[in-house]
UniProtKB/Swiss-Prot annotation:
GO cellular component: plasma membrane
Main localization of the protein described in the UniProt heading: membrane
Protein family (similarity comment): Belongs to the SecY/SEC61-alpha family.
Keywords carried by this UniProt record: Cell membrane, Membrane, Protein transport, Translocation, Transmembrane, Transmembrane helix, Transport
Recorded name of the encoding gene: secY
Protein name according to UniProt: Protein translocase subunit SecY
Subcellular locations according to the entry: Cell membrane
Transmembrane regions: 28-48, 67-89, 130-150, 165-185, 196-216, 234-254, 286-306, 329-349, 387-407, 413-433
Amino acid sequence: MQAKPTTAVKQKQNFGQRLFTLLRNRDFMISFLITVVLLVLFRVLAIIPLPGIQVNQTGLDQNSNDFFSLFNLLGGGGLNQLSLFAVGISPYISAQIVMQLLSTDLIPPLSKLVNSGEVGRRKIEMITRIITLPFALVQSFAVIQIATNSGGGSSPITLKNNGSDFVAFYIIAMTAGTYLSVFLGDTISKKGIGNGITLLILSGILAQLPEGFIAAYSVLSGVVVTINATLTTAISFFIYFMAFVTLLFATTFITQETRKIPIQQSGQGLVTESSALPYLPIKVNSAGVIPVIFASSIMSIPVTIAQFQPQTESRWFVEDYLSLSKPTGIVLYGILVILFSFFYSYIQINPERLAKNFEKSGRFIPGIRPGKDTEKHIARVLVRINFIGAPFLTVIAIIPYIVSALIHLPNSLSLGGTGIIIIVTAVVEFMSALRSAATATNYQQLRRNLAIEVQKTAQQDKEEQLRAETPGIGNLW
C-alpha cells in the first residue's frame, strides 16, 4: 500500500533529483563519457597546427575577414591555428544545405528519396558525404590562400615550405580532417548525448568566447592614460557584454516559441476543445540559422575577393559599400536575411508536402478542406509567422555589427548572430536530450521496481499456497 506514494514522488523529481538519477545510470554515464572524450579529442586536435605551419603572434583573429570568421565559426574553431580541423565541419554543412535545396521539386529523384523512409535517408546521407569532398577541397585551398596572403598586410600564417607538394598535403590533410570531424559527430549522435555535429560547433564557439572577450577589452582599452579613458573602456565593454547576454536571452525566447495548428484524425469523432487535439508545431524561427549563414557568405565573398585585387575603384566600391562595417553593407545584409528567412522556411516546412501527407494519412485541420485548401492555410500561417520571425532574426544578425561600429570594434570581434543562434540551439537540444534521458531512466527504474513488486507478490502468493497445502499433506500421515 505504501508503494504508490513513493512512485508519485519519483515522478515529480526536480532537476537536481533527475541529474542525480542520471548519474547513477550506467548507460547514461557511458554515453556522457563518450561525448566528453570525443569533444576533448576534437578540441585538442583543433589547436595543434599542421606540420610545417607557423602561426604568427598577430594570430588569425586580428587579421581575419568576415568570410574567414564564418569558416572558423562553422568549422569548429580549428581555423585559428590552421590545424587538421581547419575547415572542420563547414564543408559538410555546406553539402547538407545544398542537398536540402536540391531535395525539393528541383530534382524529382532526390525528392523521392526524401519520401522513401529510412532507406532514402541513408542514400541522401551517402550523397551528402560525396558532395562534401569538393566543398572540402575548395575550402581548404581557399583557407591556405587567405591565411598566407592577407591582402598586402602581414600574413598571419607562415608556411615553412610553400611548394606545391606541401600545399597539396595541407589540402588533403584538411579534407581528411573534415571527414574525421563528421565521424566524431556521428559517433556522438549514435553513442553519446545530443546532436554530435552541433556539439562540435558549440565546443569551438565556447572555446573562443574567453579569448574573444579578452581581445575585445584589449582593443577597447587601447593605451589607457587617464581615469576617463579607463571609465570609457569599462562602459564600452559593459555595452558589448550586455548586448551578448541580451541577444542570448532574446534568441532563447524566440527559438522556443511555436504556432500550434490543431489537426484531427478522420473517424476519430468530433472534438469540441482545440486544446485536446494534437497539433502541428511551426516555430517562429523555422528557418533556423541558415538564412544568416547564406547572407553572411554572400556579403563576405566579394569583400574577400577584393582584398586580393589592386587598389582600384571597384575594390574601393566593394569595401566601402558591401563591408559589414559600413551602414550600406549592414542594410543589405539585413535585407538578405529577411529574404532568405521567407525562402528557407518555406523549404523547411513545405506546405505542399505536408498537405499531401495529411491527405494520405487521413488527417485534417478542423474547418479546412484536405488538399489545396490545407496547403494554402499552412502557407498563410507560415507567411504570418515569418512577418514576426524574419525581422527578429534580422535584428539578432545585425545588432552585433551595429554595436561593434558604435564602440569601434573590428568585425572579427563582433558577437555574430550566427554564433549566438548556434549556442542557443545547441544548448536547447542538449538539455532536451538530458530530459529525454532522465525520463527514460525514470521509466526504467519504474519498470524494475514494478518487476520486483510483481516478483515479490508472486513469491508471497506461492508461499501462502504452500502454507495452505501443508496441513493437508500433514493429515495424510
